[in-house]
A protein has these predicted regions:
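Conserved interaction-surface patches within small, structured recognition/assembly domains
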Residues: 64-72
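Short active-site segment of divalent metal-dependent hydrolases/proteases
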Residues: 82, 86, 90
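Post-HEXXH active-site segment of zinc metalloproteases
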Residues: 75-79, 91-122, 126-129, 133
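Short acidic, S/G/P-rich loop/turn micro-motifs used as interaction or catalytic elements
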Residues: 17, 72-74
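Auxiliary, metal-adjacent structural segments of Zn-dependent hydrolase domains
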Residues: 2-63, 125, 133-138
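Short histidine-centered beta-strand/loop micro-motifs
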Residues: 56-57, 69-70, 78-80
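Short amphipathic alpha-helical segments at helix-loop
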Residues: 13, 69-70, 101, 105
């Protein structure tokens, strides 16, 4: 198996996360890249409030992902990140274009993102049990 190294730029991370949470985020991104590899660099911005285009996250053109972070458990933030990562994969590897009309509820792209993000989170919890307290906000 060949692994492609991509850069993932994290924006606003210091506003919301402890060093242990950042370590978990970085481990999770490595896990995502191993399981659903992207070929192009991506930017992930953690936001304090929703913008008009997102529920808890959104994938934007030019490989940008925005994730609502404020007042959420890390496990919820990572599920959103995983969901949007799948959408980025759909654009980078499956031929989905920014101009394509995507069905926001129940469409194939959205269903794929929902299913895979749940699977990835459960596998991450299983494979990295040492991160579980961080994911669930159970730090001392």
């Amino acid at each position: 198996m060949i692994f492609i190294k991509v850069k993932v730029k994290l924006k606003n991370k210091d506003n919301y996360f402890s060093s242990k949470e950042l370590e978990t985020i970085e481990t999770f991104i490595g896990f995502l890249q191993k399981n659903l590899p992207l070929e192009k660099d991506v930017s992930v911005a953690f936001e304090k409030e929703r913008n008009k285009h997102m529920t808890t996250g959104v994938r934007l053109p030019k490989h940008h992902i925005h994730v609502l972070a404020k007042d959420r458990l890390l496990i919820d933030v990572l599920r959103t990140l995983s969901h949007e990562w799948v959408h980025e994969f759909q654009h980078q590897k499956m031929g989905v274009k920014d101009t394509d009309k995507i069905q926001p509820i129940g469409g194939p792209e959205e269903n794929m993102a929902n299913v895979l993000s749940g699977i990835f989170l459960k596998k991450f919890i299983r494979d990295f049990p040492n991160h579980q307290p961080v994911l669930f906000g159970e730090l001392d």
